[in-house]
């Protein structure tokens, strides 16, 4: 009798334990991919994140390499042309600038052309960054050595997709940024400079 009572007590204990364990497992909050948050400097979506919106789930990445290789340079193109839709400076205008450049003069071998034809890790929706997008790359990734093990830049000017707004010079000049020093400068559209491609996620 005592042995049966002992077995019954063990059985009840096991049932109670399994029930409690099941309830505990059901209450665990398993995050989905949509809940994932990203950080600046993280490798993701074919490049390295340099900008995040307030949700920390969407932003911009820059290519991990100079387009075309370390020594390759490109002209802005469209020399002698005024492209008013390519004067966007702010974050988020790089793609619009790039599309405007290619619509006005679809020249092969230009910075914009090279960016939209770049592909990495299956991603092919790249564009030439705007002035402020380039400045953010400098500020968030290139200023110090914090992310040097993830991405590196040359001490050189990198072309933006932003044409000068100055009425006198807009047909011949575009903005570029030295990513190591962080300062912007204007240069002839025909001058060949290094480029990095950017994409949104």
Where does each model-flagged region fall?
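Extracellular adhesion/carbohydrate-recognition regions
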Residues: 25-120, 156, 172-176, 189-198
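Bacterial N-terminal signal peptides
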Residues: 9-16
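Hydrophobic core segments of beta-strands in well-ordered, beta-rich domains
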Residues: 61-63, 126-129
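General helical structural elements
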Residues: 6-8, 99, 200
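C-terminal, surface-exposed recognition/capping segments
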Residues: 32, 108, 124, 131-201
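N-terminal Sec signal peptide cleavage junction
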Residues: 20-21
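Positively charged n-region of N-terminal signal peptides that target proteins for export
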Residues: 1-5
């Amino acid at each position: 009798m005592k042995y049966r009572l002992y077995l019954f007590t063990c059985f009840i204990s096991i049932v109670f334990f399994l029930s409690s364990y099941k309830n505990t497992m059901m209450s665990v909050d398993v995050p989905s991919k949509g809940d994932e948050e990203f950080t600046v400097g993280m490798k993701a979506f074919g490049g390295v994140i340099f900008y995040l919106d307030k949700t920390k789930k969407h932003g911009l990445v820059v290519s991990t390499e100079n387009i075309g290789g370390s020594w390759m340079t490109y002209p802005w193109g469209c020399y002698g042309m005024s492209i008013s839709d390519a004067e966007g400076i702010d974050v988020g205008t790089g793609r619009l600038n790039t599309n405007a450049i290619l619509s006005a003069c679809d020249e092969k071998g230009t910075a914009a052309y090279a960016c939209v034809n770049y592909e990495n890790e299956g991603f092919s929706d790249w564009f030439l960054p705007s002035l402020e997008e380039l400045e953010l790359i400098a500020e968030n990734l290139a200023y110090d050595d914090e992310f040097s093990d993830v991405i590196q830049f040359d001490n050189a000017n990198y072309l933006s997709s932003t044409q000068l707004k100055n009425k006198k010079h807009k047909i011949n000049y575009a903005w570029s940024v030295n990513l190591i020093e962080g300062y912007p400068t204007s240069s002839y559209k025909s001058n060949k400079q290094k480029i990095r491609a950017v994409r949104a996620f």
